[in-house]
Amino acid sequence: IHSFEVENEETGGHMVHFPKSCLHCDDAPCVTVCPTGASYKREEDGIVLVNADTCIGCKLCSWACPYGAREYDEDAGIMKKCTLCVDKIYNPNLPEESRVPACVSTCPVGARSFGDLGDPDSDVSQLVASRGGYDLMPEQECRPTNKYLPPRPKKQGREGRHAPELIPVTDSSAGVIARWVDKFLSA
C-alpha cells in the first residue's frame, strides 16, 4: 500500500492510500525504458503488459514507474505487474457484468469501479465527474488512466469513533498460542 498526501484547493490536504497496482498510464515511462520491448502498451485498449518471454529482469521498468507498480519475480527472473485481468475482462464466456478485474469484483466495500472513461456516458465516467476524480501525482506527467476519488464526507455521529478495546485472553482454558500472544503483547 502506498500513501500520498493530495492537496485540493477546496478541501485542503488529505492522505490517499492505494494498492501497488498498475495505473496503465497513457505515457508509461516503464514502457519507454524497457530495452527489450517486453514492457508494452496495447494499442487497442491501452493496457500496459509485460511479455514474460522477452523480459530479461533488468528492473529498469521498476525504477521508471513512479507508482511502484512493478514487482520482480525472483523465481522466474522477470518483472510482473497488474494485467488489469485482461484475460477476464475480454472473456466472451463470462456474462458482461462479470468482466471486471478481480480487484473490483472482490473489493469488500465496493470502493473500486471499472469501465470506459473514454465514454462520457459510462457509469464510471459519471462517477468520476460527479465526485471530482483526479490523477494521482499529475506532476509526473504519466497521464494514468485510473482516477482517484476524494474521500466521501464523514457520516454524522462517527467522529472520534474508535475500534472496541481488545481484552487480553487470560482464561486458563485458552490455547498455548493465545496465552503466548497475550504474554508477548502485555510485555
Residue ranges with predicted function:
Residues 1-187:
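Non-ligating segments of multi-cofactor redox enzymes
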